[in-house]
Design a protein with these regions (language model features):
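Helix-hairpin-helix/helix-loop-helix acidic hairpins
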Residues: 139-199
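Phosphate-backbone recognition surface of nucleic-acid-processing proteins
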Residues: 190, 204-305
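Structural motif
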Residues: 79-85, 114, 196, 242-248, ...
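Short, hydrophobic/amphipathic alpha-helical patches that form generic packing surfaces
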Residues: 88-96, 118-126, 130, 202-207, ...
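Hydrophobic, well-ordered secondary-structure scaffolds
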Residues: 8-16, 20-27, 181-191, 199-211
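Phosphate- and other anionic-substrate recognition elements at nucleic-acid/protein interfaces
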Residues: 1-150, 351
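Low-complexity, acidic/Ser/Thr- and charged residue-rich accessory regions of DNA metabolism proteins
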Residues: 271-351
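Short helix-capping/linker segments at secondary-structure and domain boundaries
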Residues: 97-102, 210-213, 258-267, 321-332
Length: 351
């Protein structure tokens, strides 16, 4: 089947298409790539292509799907293609995949619209911060403190706010209204124990997309930066190296867990205490059943707390993956765990 594999090159991240068919491939970029895509769009429903990307909010795939092009995807785990191959070799390998391993591409225009609003909001915030800092630097360079700013400088800084609120306030309302309509956002808020609509679920869902593209929960963990590298450590960004995980998703999750702990979130806090207690038990002695080795680090509380945070994140992500995967389970393992912890807490108080 005609296969598309895309990579980005250069500082400008120009998209490069590797198109394969019958075991041979060609590299297209710039005007040639656009002309080839226009040709595929013109044929419409007569075209059938296989994409190595299954992202439901991919602009290129959404445009092709809108024109009626039949798009299929295949999980990397099911086809057994090594991700370390050259781009052209990856496209050739996917073009030979059996039809039984293919699955229809799911286009999510609602998530794409949400993603656009989130990106716009983030850009406005960065612009406001940049301009405000530049104006404040005027006072720093002239040696004037904030309480002695001249009137014109105060007016310029205040102009970045509307009705006493940041300029992104209206965008926040639009993002929240959009998130209310998307089932994944509602599910995220419920599983993470969040009462009110916030920007958090919109940020996470808009960068993760439809979870059906992940064959296992481990794939979702990996995409969100919750996996362990070959050297046994958490993943980190490296200069000049491409990431196979999403830094934005990991940042959103870390902030969500951190805020939940500070606010005594009814879901996050009990789970954290439960996992931290288990980590403290096995920190010095290890665990023969799981093969965990004893740890003799000097920062026992901090180490166990960090491991507990990671376990909470992975557990909640697992529940989110199950809930959005169409299983229809109402009473999850997480809910049972929370009920058991609450019962234990009531018993301990009574004693």
């Amino acid at each position: 089947m005609l296969t598309i594999h895309r990579k980005y090159s250069g500082v400008a991240k120009e998209p490069v298409l590797y198109v394969a068919d019958n075991g041979t491939h060609q590299e297209l970029k710039g005007a040639k790539a656009r002309a080839w895509l226009d040709k595929i769009c013109a044929t419409g429903k007569q075209s059938r292509i296989l994409s190595t990307s299954a992202c439901s909010i991919d602009d290129m795939l959404l445009a092709l799907a809108e024109r009626g092009v039949q798009i299929f995807t295949a999980h990397w785990h099911s086809v057994g293609v090594d991700k370390k191959l050259e781009p052209g070799e990856i496209a050739e390998a996917f073009s030979k995949v059996a039809d039984s391993a293919l699955r229809p591409y799911i286009a999510r225009t609602d998530l794409a619209a949400l993603r656009g609003r989130v990106i716009t909001r983030n850009a406005v915030i960065e612009y406001r911060k940049s301009v405000a800092n530049s104006l404040r630097n005027v006072g720093l360079r002239t040696g004037v403190s904030a309480d002695r700013y001249p009137k014109w400088l105060k007016e310029e800084i205040e102009a970045l706010r509307t009705d006493g609120k940041p300029v992104e306030y209206d965008l926040d309302k639009q993002v929240k209204a959009e998130a209310e309509k998307i089932p994944e956002c509602v599910t995220f808020r419920r599983i993470f124990g969040m009462k009110d609509v916030s920007i958090v679920e919109a940020q996470f869902v808009s960068c993760v997309g439809d979870t059906s593209r992940f064959p296992t929960v481990g794939s979702l963990w990996h995409y969100c930066g919750q996996h362990v590298t070959d050297d046994g450590k958490a993943p980190h960004r490296k200069r000049g190296a491409a990431n196979d995980w999403n830094p934005e998703a990991r940042t959103v999750l870390w902030n969500t867990i951190d805020t939940g702990l500070k606010a005594n979130n009814p879901v996050i806090r009990p789970l954290y205490e439960y996992y931290k207690a288990k980590e403290l038990e096995t920190h010095d002695a290890g665990n023969a059943e799981t093969g965990k080795k004893p740890c003799k680090c000097e920062t026992k509380q901090g180490h166990c707390g960090a491991r507990a945070r990671r376990r909470v994140t992975k557990e909640l992500l697992k529940q989110y993956y199950v809930a959005t995967g169409g299983t229809g389970q109402q009473r999850t393992v997480l809910q049972s765990t929370i009920c058991r912890l609450e019962s234990m807490r009531r018993v301990s108080k009574a004693a």
